[in-house]
């Protein structure tokens, strides 16, 4: 499913029917107010800023995004544990197989529905990716020659499910793939105090898709941007298209805007 083929681009006259000047002003002001370094203090994006090396930042971002569900006070310590075990050298920790010592291959709970076995197999598949392609960045460049976010999301879904790993990375893009969309926001958006922007030359940030969850859905509905409470890639693309009307060169600035609107209201 590709945003460019599933979303009908509305003309400017129709745009005015779902987005008035007040809504546009509210979202632009909220984006400016909340996309700051302080945002990192309570966001899992914080962890990817800790490693010094570029490819360690990539791996930390990928793992942190995959772990980011549920209550932050519960999953933050789990991400911190991985950072501590690796001593911030994520690539070396995975390639050396040291993760197998720190996260033994058993059925004990690691975090919520993720057992140690699930995490172990996930990290093993990530290890295979790093061995085969050299880095997450090179994987992205290889699988997204069209520079589109949806192409790379599909590639991640396919790669991590080739060997039956279906618990952490979605099987396909029927779901909203929230955590993969969030990971790509982190990696692609440039000139941000929050996002790294390391892959801005690989993925066109105009093709990024909003990480869709119940909170985003709620605020988007309150503003009249969408009229559904379901989460799917189709809905994520629809909302992203609306945000692109406000932020043409950087639609995921709207992610901060909706967050800020929710806080303010």
Where are these regions (language model features)?
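HhH-family (HhH-GPD) DNA N-glycosylase catalytic core used in base-excision repair
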Residues: 14-265
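Generic cytosolic/nucleocytoplasmic N-terminal low-complexity/intrinsically disordered segments
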Residues: 10-12
């Amino acid at each position: 499913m590709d945003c460019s083929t599933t979303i009908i681009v509305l003309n400017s006259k129709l745009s005015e029917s779902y987005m008035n000047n007040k809504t546009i002003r509210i979202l632009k002001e909220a984006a400016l107010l909340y996309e700051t370094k302080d945002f990192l203090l309570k966001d899992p994006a914080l962890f990817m800023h800790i490693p010094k090396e570029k490819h360690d930042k990539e791996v930390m971002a990928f793992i942190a995004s995959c772990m980011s569900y549920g209550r932050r006070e519960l999953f933050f310590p789990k991400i911190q544990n991985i950072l501590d075990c690796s001593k911030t050298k994520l690539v070396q920790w995975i390639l050396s197989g040291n993760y197998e010592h720190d996260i033994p291959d058993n059925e004990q709970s690691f975090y919520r529905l993720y057992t140690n076995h699930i995490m172990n197999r996930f990290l093993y598949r990530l290890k295979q990716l790093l061995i085969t392609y050299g880095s997450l960045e090179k994987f992205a460049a290889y699988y997204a020659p069209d520079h589109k976010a949806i192409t790379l999301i599909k590639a991640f879904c396919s790669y991590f499910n080739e060997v039956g790993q279906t618990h952490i990375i979605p099987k396909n893009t029927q779901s909203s793939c929230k955590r993969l969309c969030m990971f790509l926001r982190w990696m692609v958006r440039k000139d941000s105090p929050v996002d790294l922007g390391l892959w801005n030359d690989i993925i066109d940030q105009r093709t990024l898709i909003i990480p869709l969850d119940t909170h985003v859905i709620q605020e988007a509905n309150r503003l009249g941007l969408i009229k559904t409470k379901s989460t799917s890639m189709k809905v994520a693309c629809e909302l992203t298209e609306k945000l692109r009307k406000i932020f043409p060169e950087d639609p995921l600035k709207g992610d901060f805007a909706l967050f800020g609107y929710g806080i303010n209201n």
